[in-house]
C-alpha cells in the first residue's frame, strides 16, 4: 500500500468503513441560525492542503480552497472547478487546462496560471524558494509531473512522464487544492496558520485547542454560501463530543462512536451514513522486533477476531477487509479474495515456531482520527486477542496529531505496531 514504506507491513483489521455524521434538525447551540458548529475529533495539524494527510484537516480545507477539478457530490467522478475545461493529448502525457476567469484569492490576489504553477512547483521542486514550507507528505500523488507550463495567463499545461490514469482524480483530492502564492510568500512556514484560498469560506481565526472559524466568502465564483460561518471545535474525547451534541453545544458531529448511535434516534437528529473507500489497518514494524519474522505477522492476522470487532465494537458499521482495496471501488474489487480467518490455534502454532512466545509488543493507539470510529475500543480488542495467543501487548494512547508525529516517520525504535486508517481516491 502506498501509505507504507518498505520497513513496515500492514495487516488489515477492518475495512470498508461507513462514514457516520450526525446533525441536529432543531439547532440548540448558542449561535445564530446561519452559523454551524461542528464537533471535530482533533485540532487540525495545519491549514495548508499540501502539508496534511488527515480527513480531520481536509474537512476544514475543502471549505477554504478550490482545486482545478473536484468530485461530484457523493461520487469519485471529476467535474470542473477552478478549471472550466481541459484537453488531454493523444498519448495521455499532456493535460491543458483552461482556467476560470475573474477568480480572486481571499487575500485579493488573482487566481491565474502562474498561481497553479507555483502550487505544484512548491510541492515537487526542491529548489523552489518556498519548498521549505513543507514537508509535503502526499506529493507523490503528483510525482508523474515533469513540468507545469504557463501558456497564457489563464491556460496551464501539465506534462507527465507517462500516461497516468488517476491524474485528474488526484487533482480533485485535497492535496491538489490551490493556495495563494502571495499568502505563502508573506507567511512562509507559518502559512498553515494563515491560509488563503479561493473557497466558499475564508479564514476567520484559529484559537488553539478551541476552534477554527471560517467565514462566508460573498465573492465566491459559485455565489455566496447560505451559512455565514462554520465553527470547527476540536473535541478529542468521543464521549464528550456525544455529550456536547446532546446538550446542544454543537450542531453536527463526525466520527460518531457506534455505541452512541442509539442516543440519536429521536426526531431531533439526523444520522448520515455513507460507505466509502476507507480501510482501517495495523502497521507492523517488520524491520525489528517480533514482527520482523513473517510467521509472527501471520499469527497476528490469524489471532485477531475481526468479525467480533465489526459486530461488537463497531456495531456493524464496517466490514472485514480481504485486502487493501475497499469494495467502494466496485470495478477494481476482487470478490473472490477471502480475508485471513480467525484461527487462534494457528496463531499459537506460528508464534511457537518463531520462538516468540511471551514476546512483548508496544502498540500505538490514537484517541480518534482518520475516520476510525472507536479506535481505543478497537485497540483494546486487538490487545486482548493477541494476548490470548501468547503475546504481551502494551498500549500507548495518543492524541491524533501527536500520534501522527510518532507514526508517520516510522515505528523503528519506538513501537511494534500501530493503528491507522487510509482513505483514497484510487485503488492503485
What is the predicted function of each stretch?
Residues 84-129, 157, 290-292:
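Aromatic- and charge-enriched surface segment that lines or borders ligand/interaction sites
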Residues 72-73, 164-225, 229, 239, ...:
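Gly/Pro-rich hinge or "lid" segments in bacterial periplasmic/extracellular proteins
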Residues 320-353, 369-377:
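Structural transition elements
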Residues 39-90, 121, 128, 196:
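N-terminal lobe/hinge region of extracytoplasmic solute-binding protein
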Amino acid at each position: 500500500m502506498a501509505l507504507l514504506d518498505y520497513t513496515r507491513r500492514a495487516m488489515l483489521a477492518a475495512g470498508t468503513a461507513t462514514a457516520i455524521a450526525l446533525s441536529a434538525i432543531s439547532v440548540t447551540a448558542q449561535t445564530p441560525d446561519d452559523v454551524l458548529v461542528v464537533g471535530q475529533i482533533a485540532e487540525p495539524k495545519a491549514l495548508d492542503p499540501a502539508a496534511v494527510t488527515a480527513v480531520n484537516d481536509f474537512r476544514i480545507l475543502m471549505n477554504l480552497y478550490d482545486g482545478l477539478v473536484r468530485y461530484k457530490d457523493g461520487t469519485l467522478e471529476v467535474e470542473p472547478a477552478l478549471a472550466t475545461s481541459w484537453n488531454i493529448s493523444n498519448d495521455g502525457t499532456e493535460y491543458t487546462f483552461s482556467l476560470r476567469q475573474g477568480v480572486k484569492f481571499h487575500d485579493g490576489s488573482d487566481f491565474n496560471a502562474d498561481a497553479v504553477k507555483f502550487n505544484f512547483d512548491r510541492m515537487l521542486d526542491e529548489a523552489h524558494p518556498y519548498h521549505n514550507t513543507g514537508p509535503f507528505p502526499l506529493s507523490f500523488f503528483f510525482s508523474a509531473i515533469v513540468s507545469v507550463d504557463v501558456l497564457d495567463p489563464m491556460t496551464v499545461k501539465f506534462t507527465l512522464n507517462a500516461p497516468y490514469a488517476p491524474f485528474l482524480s488526484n487533482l480533485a483530492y485535497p492535496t491538489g487544492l490551490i493556495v495563494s502564492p502571495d499568502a505563502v510568500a508573506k507567511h512562509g512556514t507559518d502559512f498553515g496558520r494563515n491560509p488563503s484560498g479561493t473557497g466558499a469560506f475564508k479564514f476567520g481565526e484559529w484559537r488553539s485547542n478551541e476552534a477554527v472559524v471560517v467565514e462566508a466568502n460573498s465573492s465566491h465564483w459559485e455565489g455566496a454560501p447560505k451559512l455565514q460561518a462554520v465553527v470547527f471545535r476540536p473535541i478529542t474525547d468521543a464521549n464528550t463530543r456525544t455529550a456536547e451534541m446532546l446538550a446542544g453545544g454543537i450542531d453536527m458531529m463526525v466520527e460518531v462512536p457506534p455505541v452512541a448511535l442509539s442516543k440519536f434516534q429521536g426526531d431531533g437528529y439526523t444520522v448520515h451514513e455513507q460507505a466509502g473507500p476507507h480501510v482501517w489497518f495495523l502497521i507492523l514494524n517488520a524491520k525489528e522486533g517480533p514482527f520482523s519474522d513473517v510467521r509472527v505477522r501471520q499469527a497476528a492476522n490469524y489471532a485477531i477476531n475481526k468479525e467480533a470487532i465489526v459486530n461488537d465494537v463497531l456495531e456493524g458499521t464496517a466490514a472485514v477487509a480481504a485486502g487493501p482495496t475497499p469494495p467502494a471501488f466496485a470495478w477494481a474489487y476482487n470478490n473472490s479474495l477471502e480475508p485471513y480467518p480467525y484461527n487462534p490455534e494457528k496463531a499459537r502454532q506460528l508464534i511457537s515456531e518463531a520462538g516468540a512466545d511471551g514476546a512483548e509488543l508496544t502498540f500505538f493507539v490514537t484517541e480518534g482520527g482518520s475516520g476510525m470510529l472507536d479506535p481505543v475500543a478497537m485497540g483494546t480488542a486487538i490487545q486482548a486477542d493477541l494476548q490470548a495467543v501468547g503475546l504481551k501487548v502494551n498500549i500507548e494512547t495518543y492524541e491524533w496529531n501527536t500520534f501522527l508525529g510518532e507514526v508517520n516517520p516510522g515505528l523503528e525504535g519506538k513501537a511494534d505496531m500501530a493503528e491507522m486508517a487510509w482513505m483514497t481516491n484510487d485503488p492503485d
